[in-house]
Amino acid sequence: MLLGGLALTCSIAFQASATEKFKVITTFTIIADMAKNVAGDAAEVSSITKPGAEIHEYQPTPGDIKRAQGAQLILANGMNLELWFQRFYQHLNGVPEVIVSSGVTPVGITEGPYEGKPNPHAWMSP
């Protein structure tokens, strides 16, 4: 499903005008990297967060909202990884979203304080 969401990005991107790239925004850099690899030159992909940012409790800025409103698609991980995303998304009028982990069965965390809970880091799941 993760790749399905990214493939959707690519197919939509090819429908964009030849002079203007399809604009995709992601919730964090790992999804942005995957989307860039799928879409290639057909899309302009950027991440709301910067490399190294704490994704779980990120605090979006008004500038983040403004940038996201200019996107044609927003990609989010889901699985409650981005605790801030649903509130953030309420400020975006009509920007389609794809939850890239839809349909993914997460692996359980095997140690530490979250042992036994589902791992929301879907890109790390086998």
Model-derived segments and spans:
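Bacterial N-terminal signal peptides
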Residues: 2-11
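Extracytoplasmic metal-acquisition and chelation regions
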Residues: 14-126
